[in-house]
Amino acid sequence: MNQREKSFATKNKILNAASMLFLEKGYEETTMQDIMERSGVSKGAIYHYFASKQEIISFMIKDAQKHINTRFLEIADDNSLSVEEKIKAVITYFIENREQNILISNKWIDKVPYALVDTIRNANKYIAPQIAKIIKQGTQNGNFQCNYPDELAEVLIQLFDVWLDPVITERTLVETVNRLKFIFHLLDCIGVPLFSKENITVILSLFEKARTDI
């Protein structure tokens, strides 16, 4: 193993240990000492890569963004999938995204300065264009008619990424579910029913789990 591979392996040990501890104990209760002991990495090594646990969670946020961007691109560009299948693939990804769920449960937005701004910018720059591709596919295939796919994609990103984020809002589960239903109703009203009944059921379950886990 060369030096670059050793460095990568050490960094991953630290991140994996931090992820497990954040999940088990919570961000606030986890110390750098805890992470050092769980990872088996020396004090000098851990501080070589991360000056604080805030830097660790900041890295986790950026890493999660990269994974999300890549997965959205893969789904949007998969010509073998229908619009409904692509939406289902997106939902499945978020359900199974362990790193994202850890960040949500630890209220990531309170931990890193400007994290929300960076997340919104990332979503508009990388994720919205992929959502727009799926909407355009639906129009081309005759599933629905949408004259403003790019604009609708950006609106949906803001609604799901900010308006419905359980970390940002402090609404009850009932209030959150009502807003979800409003989004689905709004899409139906403008003639762009992106979400099937099956997908709507899965999304509602996902948000209920997110709200009860934080």
Enumerate the predicted regions with their spans:
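Alpha-helical DNA-contacting segments of helix-turn-helix folds
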Residues: 58-64
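C-terminal peripheral helix-coil segments that are non-catalytic and often amphipathic
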Residues: 129, 133-140, 169, 173-214
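Hydrophobic alpha-helical connector segments
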Residues: 59, 73-101, 153-156
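Basic, helix-initiating cap at the start of DNA-binding domains
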Residues: 1-25, 29-41, 54-58
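Short secondary-structure transition hinges
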Residues: 95, 99-144, 150
